[in-house]
């Protein structure tokens, strides 16, 4: 059952669905010095070079490990490039195939698609520069392939609904659940694997995991009359979280992502 049948979408929010065809090119990168980071920043700021299909880029710098169950190296930066419909033909050679500039070591590159009803941002999203207490949570998740359908159902019917409420209440900046569609490159030392990435801007002080946040958000109004902790317990049996980090936002040139929802323009509330 679609989430639309029991929850109307607040007019201050955009929820990007798979049929909106938002495509994300993600790169996990290790940089050697500040000059190399400056090169990444310059590329993210000048994202328009990738043409009309590109909706922007964002760049995050690693700050701390929240949870780790992998021996793979911890990369210094994550870069997300957003496209409508398909990745621009210029992007993959520059970002993946060609030799990278000095000091930039590519560890993994992949194509991501949105998880059903679980990619939520405000209509007026302009980044989190005005919320210095927030950090960017990046959760790397491995779902057993045979359970992907069940995972999407739980994300759509419970996690996505809770995320909408938390973004609407400004508890979270955005909540962006994405699924790996294709791995374009993986360095030999990258032994860790995942097939989902969840991004969320939040205040880490007092944060004790999404399960508790989502359960509290759904405590009053339960989807399908199911106890939220039961639904979230299902996730624990079908997925692992090899790594979960907190990061600083270096570049957030991604406000145009909301424009991929062409069929439902945002309404501004005063």
How should each PLM-predicted stretch be described?
Residues 1-224, 229-270:
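Short S/T/G/P-rich N-terminal loop/turn motif that feeds into the first structured element of a domain
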């Amino acid at each position: 059952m679609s989430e639309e049948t029991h929850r109307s979408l607040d007019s201050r929010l955009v929820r990007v669905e798979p049929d909106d065809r938002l495509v994300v090119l993600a790169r996990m990168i290790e940089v050697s010095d500040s000059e190399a980071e400056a090169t990444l920043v310059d590329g993210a700021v000048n994202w328009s070079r990738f043409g009309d299909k590109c909706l922007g880029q964002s760049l995050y710098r690693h700050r701390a490990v929240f949870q780790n169950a992998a021996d793979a190296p911890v990369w210094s930066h994550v870069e997300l490039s957003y496209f409508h419909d398909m990745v621009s033909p210029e992007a993959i050679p520059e970002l993946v195939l060609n030799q990278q500039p000095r000091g930039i070591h590519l560890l993994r590159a992949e194509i991501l698609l949105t998880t059903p009803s679980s990619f939520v941002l405000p209509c007026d999203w302009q980044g989190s520069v005005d919320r210095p207490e927030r950090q960017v949570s990046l959760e790397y998740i491995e779902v057993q392939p045979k359970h992907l359908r069940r995972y999407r159902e739980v994300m759509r019917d419970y996690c996505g609904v809770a995320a909408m409420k938390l973004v609407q209440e400004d508890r979270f900046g955005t909540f962006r659940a994405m699924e790996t569609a294709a791995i374009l490159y993986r360095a030999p030392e990258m032994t860790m694997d995942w097939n989902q990435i969840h991004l969320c801007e939040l205040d880490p002080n007092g944060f004790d995991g999404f399960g508790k946040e989502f359960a509290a958000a759904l405590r009053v109004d339960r989807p399908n009359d199911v106890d939220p902790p039961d639904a979230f317990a299902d996730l624990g049996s079908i997925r692992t979280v090899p790594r979960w980090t907190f990061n600083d936002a270096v570049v957030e040139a991604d406000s145009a992502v909301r424009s991929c929802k062409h069929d439902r323009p945002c309404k501004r509330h005063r």
